[in-house]
């Protein structure tokens, strides 16, 4: 949910390359590959009254093929706020986190083989 649907949609389109699949003044649906995200006005009538406050503590994961290239591109943009730099995790990710509109955190991830400590935690395909 967003207090400024247009600005949030612009963030995802311009910084990350999402394409618009539906757009109105209170709702925008955006797609990047197989990933789709919707931005909805927090105060719209379709949201039950007790749930119209903007959520806090939301992190959205976005899996990419080349996290280093995405990081380079976004780090070069002075309007991008990277809140956690690029790093590898033993649990099987190379990632960084940036601030998105409305207090959302966007975790941009490229999967890596996990360490032996975490390998058994993954479900087999």
List the predicted regions and their residue ranges.
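Vicinal oxygen chelate
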Residues: 19-62, 71-99, 110-125
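Conserved beta-strand-loop-alpha-helix junction that forms the acyl-donor binding cleft
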Residues: 2-5, 90
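Short, conserved charged micro-motifs
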Residues: 7, 67-71
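Acidic di-acidic motifs
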Residues: 4, 66, 100
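Conserved active-site tyrosine of GNAT-family acetyltransferases
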Residues: 8-13, 74, 103
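Structured catalytic cores of enzymes that bind and process phosphorylated ligands/cofactors
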Residues: 104-109
